[in-house]
Amino acid sequence: VEKVFATTSKRILKFKTGDVVSATLLHKEGLSSQITAILKTPHYQRVTIFGDKGWVELIDSSHPDTPGPSELILRMNNGKIKKTNLNWTDTVSANINNFINAVQRKKEYIFTDEEKFQNVAVLDAINKSSLKRKVINIK
């Protein structure tokens, strides 16, 4: 990710960070992606990645630690649409267990150090962009 523009809003919840976040990410490879999360009215999370041959979107209707349906939509330039309903998986517990196994040297952690640093940089840029209301470049 090279650039991030994000906004947040406080509608119902009293969270310091607000209850709605929307971020546009511009990637080095030329792709762009959109992340949206609404923590109330009801909960909604969406990640969409736009490429030159089509787009893919994942929609979650519940928080990662709460059972609920997800839908994956793939739309290609040829007009074909593929929709897949996904069953809930407890990714929060799976990540914690994977981390414990990595600390105990039983398994490799699912994210490389480079991916972890990039994730932190993106989250930091989302925070800065939402506060400054401008595009943030990631170095």
Regions inferred by a protein language model and the residue ranges of each:
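Short polybasic amphipathic segments
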Residues: 47, 64-77
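C-terminal helix-rich "cap/oligomerization" subdomain common to oxidoreductases
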Residues: 28, 98-139
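Short loop/turn segments at connectors of secondary-structure elements within structured domains
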Residues: 43, 66-68, 132
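Structured beta->alpha junctions
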Residues: 39-41, 88, 115
